[in-house]
Amino acid sequence: MMEGLDDGPDFLSEEDRGLKAINVDLQSDAALQVDISDALSERDKVKFTVHTKSSLPNFKQNEFSVVRQHEEFIWLHDSFVENEDYAGYIIPPAPPRPDFDASREKLQKLGEGEGSMTKEEFTKMKQELEAEYLAIFKKTVAMHEVFLCRVAAHPILRRDLNFHVFLEYNQDLSVRGKNKKEKLEDFFKNMVKSADGVIVSGVKDVDDFFEHERTFLLEYHNRVKDASAKSDRMTRSHKSAADDYNRIGSSLYALGTQDSTDICKFFLKVSELFDKTRKIEARVSADEDLKLSDLLKYYLRESQAAKDLLYRRSRSLVDYENANKALDKARAKNKDVLQAETSQQLCCQKFEKISESAKQELIDFKTRRVAAFRKNLVELAELELKHAKGNLQLLQNCLAVLNGDT
């Protein structure tokens, strides 16, 4: 038998591929620690057990857990977005909706085609699809945990009453998903926001820092979007290669078991090479997905949240400029001057408040994303080297065995 890499546990069930796989370099704070300690999938729903440890006086207990569903996470996110007090902050992006349809469909098709496979082929494919389902499930849990950790780490958002209710209230929050009418309303709101964004984007910013950030984030968001799509194609290519190795290895194994001749022994040894190479290629795909693709997807959403912050500030700037014009007109006509002055002062205060917090938010965003990308890219490079050395070792061992038999 060939001496290759230690097969060990499957790459999707390794401990370090769990809930902490998606890294955004969060700053932890012992005063408030939130994690998802457990999760249960029930048909189309996932129930998350949110575990909290806190020494803050706002909570009745120091440690407690509640069960939450995806819709309740969305409710919490939307409550931040809709709160005018948080207009000057980057709202952590909402976690994506759990989607296991593709994995379930693959498992169903596998069951339907069981009769056309050998028992070994069916068992191997079933294990791989179940591992794929588990990986998606873990990733879903991780995305929801990252959202809560980002909120818990934020000095302002962590004080929010709705966040405390989400963490501590041990009953159902009675939150439902949006119906068709509400989704249509959201669609029109986004249309209006897009049109308004075009108007707002044409306004020259009075602060060079924000003008630079607006230009940079627009380019950055587009580049991350493009990189995310290409990263997905790359991981799919590695996964396809692993699937091809599996099919080639299975065919060679079938040929090798037909007889006990030297050529059949050769087929069996090469079949083993393809099987072990398949595992490495699958690990490469999984590592690239976790360390790069997921990170790009997260920062694609967070860069959009940063763009939304700049939109709110620009909108406030336009309102402030319009209030100044209205005040000038009121003074010229000597009519409703007090009302115009009050409106102008409120717009000025709002704009200055948003600008003050937004500047620090954007600086923190840069620090956070640079640290996250540096950490993940270094780890990915180390894993790629490890897998490349593993592949080389497998090929050398295989050649040594085959040459020794000839």
UniProtKB/Swiss-Prot annotation:
Membrane topology value: Peripheral membrane protein
Binding site for a 1,2-diacyl-sn-glycero-3-phospho-(1D-myo-inositol-4,5-bisphosphate): 41-47, 100-106, 114-117
Chain spans, region Membrane-binding amphipathic helix: 182-199
Any one Pfam family match given in the protein's UniProt record, by short name: PX
A single BP term in Gene Ontology: negative regulation of DNA-templated transcription
Modification note: In vitro phosphorylated by PIM1; not affecting PIM1-dependent nuclear translocation.
Start and end residues of each PX domain: 26-173
Residues in BAR domain copies: 203-406
Compartments, as annotated in UniProt: Early endosome; Early endosome membrane; Cytoplasmic vesicle; Cytoplasm
Domain of life, per lineage: Eukaryota
Single GO MF annotation: phosphatidylinositol binding
Effect annotated for changing R68A: Reduces interaction with SNX1. Abolishes location at endosome membranes
Annotated region described as Interaction with PIM1, given as residue ranges: 2-179
Modified residues (N-acetylmethionine): M1, M2
Gene Ontology CC terms, in alphabetical order: cytoplasm; cytosol; early endosome membrane; endosome; glutamatergic synapse; lysosome; nucleus; postsynaptic early endosome
Listed SUPFAM superfamilies: BAR/IMD domain-like, PX domain
Keyword vocabulary terms for this entry: Acetylation, Cytoplasm, Cytoplasmic vesicle, Endosome, Lipid-binding, Membrane, Nucleus, Phosphoprotein, Protein transport, Transport
Domain comment in the entry: The PX domain mediates interaction with membranes enriched in phosphatidylinositol 3,4-bisphosphate and/or phosphatidylinositol 4,5-bisphosphate.
Subunit field text: Forms heterodimers with BAR domain-containing sorting nexins SNX1 and SNX2. The heterodimers are proposed to self-assemble into helical arrays on the membrane to stabilize and expand local membrane curvature underlying endosomal tubule formation.
Function as written in the Swiss-Prot or TrEMBL entry: Involved in several stages of intracellular trafficking. Interacts with membranes phosphatidylinositol 3,4-bisphosphate and/or phosphatidylinositol 4,5-bisphosphate. Acts in part as component of the retromer membrane-deforming SNX-BAR subcomplex. The SNX-BAR retromer mediates retrograde transport of cargo proteins from endosomes to the trans-Golgi network (TGN) and is involved in endosome-to-plasma membrane transport for cargo protein recycling. The SNX-BAR subcomplex functions to deform the donor membrane into a tubular profile called endosome-to-TGN transport carrier (ETC).
Protein name: Sorting nexin-6
Naturally occurring in which organism (per UniProt): Homo sapiens
Annotated gene: SNX6
